[in-house]
From Swiss-Prot:
SUPFAM superfamilies: Clavaminate synthase-like
Pathway: Secondary metabolite biosynthesis; terpenoid biosynthesis
Assembly and oligomerization: Homodimer.
Classification of source organism: Eukaryota, Fungi, Dikarya, Ascomycota, Pezizomycotina
GO terms for MF: dioxygenase activity; metal ion binding
Gene Ontology process terms (BP): terpenoid biosynthetic process
Known cofactor(s): Fe cation
Annotated protein name in UniProt: Dioxygenase cdmD
UniProt source species: Talaromyces verruculosus
InterPro entries in the record: Phytyl_CoA_dOase-like
Assigned protein family: Belongs to the PhyH family.
Technological use: Compounds in the chrodrimanin family such as chrodrimanin A or verruculide A exhibit strong inhibitory activities against protein tyrosine phosphatase 1B (PTP1B) and therefore, they could potentially be developed into drugs for the treatment of type 2 diabetes or obesity. Furthermore, chrodrimanin B, the end product of the pathway involving chrodrimanin A or verruculide A, does not exhibit the PTP1B inhibitory activity, while it functions as a potent blocker of insect GABA-gated chloride channels.
Signal peptide: none
EC supergroup of this enzyme: oxidoreductase
Length: 307
């Protein structure tokens, strides 16, 4: 199925005053929405200060082998590596590194309101798949268009437009996202493409850049084709992605290694996001238990008051 979108009007721009029902409608129709002022400038500055050292020490995307693409198919694991970028840093472990991430990001009320609308009826509880700082240096080439749900084998079996979505991403701008410094490129409506629609990897006329000011966010479904743009500027481009999915799925990023004292400084909701609490599916059946008991009870887990 091919879906035609008016590029001049998408992604729609919303703020916290926009009715949540309208926001969800835009996400389901276009696959993405831009949120103005998702985080305030002071919070962005605190987050930047907490991650700066780790980003500076971090290495660029994983090296990949050079394949003769005309001679045969490139292994899928190498395709994944190419998506990491030779001049892009992926700084992970945010829940350990940043107090602002633990307190402000993981408890973001609007973010959770969106997740509840997307997942509640279909799946029940949800948790964090992963969270990264995405730092693009000048000279980084455009990333190929892809769907983040490709990490799930089950995504190949989604066939109908009304099949449930099982990943939603919140990409927050920590610096400006401009067309010349690698703003994320989105193909609105591509979450509705079925197997009959040939995938688009580079240079799509249907793609639009997500132009953002620091603190803005683009919220997009994992089934939407997207990719980081080319950084033709002299500035780095930095963002933070927080990926959420149903509790049914195993996250890409584990948080078992977090010291208990750090986890106990978090709210119950934030603890759930990093897998330190038992959750329920859409039928109120417990998921992620310790025997027949809740993880938090077995661990005698303390928590911070609601943030």
């Amino acid at each position: 199925m091919t879906v035609t979108i008016n590029k001049s009007s998408v992604p729609h721009k919303v703020d916290f005053a926009t009715p949540l029902s309208d926001v969800i409608c835009h996400i389901k129709e276009d696959g993405a929405v831009i949120v103005r002022g998702f985080m305030d400038v002071e919070t962005i500055q605190k987050l930047q200060e907490e991650v700066d050292t780790a980003v500076e020490k971090g290495s660029f995307g994983p090296r990949y082998q050079e394949y003769n693409e005309e001679a045969g198919e490139i292994p899928k694991h190498e395709i994944y590596k190419r998506g990491e970028g030779k001049k892009t840093k992926h700084m992970k472990n945010l829940a350990l590194t940043s107090e602002t991430f633990r307190n402000d990001v993981l408890n973001h009320k609007w973010m959770h309101a969106v997740c509840e609308q997307i997942y509640g009826e279909e799946f029940g509880d949800y948790w964090m798949n992963c969270a990264h700082i995405l730092h693009l240096e000048p000279g980084e080439k455009a990333q190929f268009f892809h769907r983040d749900t490709g990490v799930y084998r089950v995504s190949d079996f989604r066939r109908r437009l009304n099949d449930p979505e099982f990943m939603i991403n919140f990409l927050v701008s920590l610096t400006e996202f401009r067309e010349d410094n690698g703003a994320t490129q989105l193909i609105p409506g591509s979450h509705k493409w079925d197997a009959a629609h040939p995938p688009t990897f580079y240079g799509s006329d249907e793609a639009v850049p997500a132009i953002l000011e620091p603190g803005d966010a683009v919220v997009y479904l994992g089934s939407l084709f997207h990719g980081a743009g080319e950084n033709r500027s002299l500035d780095y481009r930095r963002g933070m992605i927080v990926s959420m999915h149903p509790a049914h799925f195993t996250p890409m990023e584990s948080h078992f290694h977090l010291p208990k004292e750090i986890v106990e400084s978090m709210t119950p909701l934030a603890q759930q996001m990093v897998g330190w609490r038992t959750m329920n599916n859409q039928n109120k059946i417990p998921i992620w238990q310790a025997g027949d008991d809740k993880i938090e009870d077995v661990l005698r887990l303390q928590h911070k008051e609601v943030y």
